[in-house]
Amino acid sequence: MMERERLDEALATLGALLQERGEHFNALVIGGGSLLLLGVVERPTADIDVVGYPSATGYAKADVLPDFLVAAVRDVGDALGLGPAWFNSGPAGLVDFGLPPGLADRVTVRTYGTLEVHLPALEDLVCFKLYAAVDLTERSKHFTDLQALAPSAEQLLQA
């Protein structure tokens, strides 16, 4: 599990390694990692959830991460004791349902070497967390995260 400082360290290490190897990647990140980086929650996260990368039409689905990135993620995971899947595209299928309109205009971009991490605005994270919280109990981390976002009735209806 990674606290905010450890998460920043891992991303900085990954960005520096990509830069050293002459590679770059831009990732749209959701989930607990994005909430932690934005300071919405204090709970640690197990991983970074990548759903997409910038494209000419907004964000494309990141269902398969490029080999150079997978290798760098593995190397950083080994070096920092995070395991090989600490940065993954597990929830990329959310893109198939459609991203919130205007999301690309509202992201916050954090740069770590040649790695850009795109963090959705809180209103967009409400959409993702509402989706994740469906069919789960009030004790789930997704439900707790949704409560931390404190969405308005309008945001919930839009989500």
Residue spans for each PLM region:
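Compositionally biased terminal segments of proteins
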Residues: M1-A159
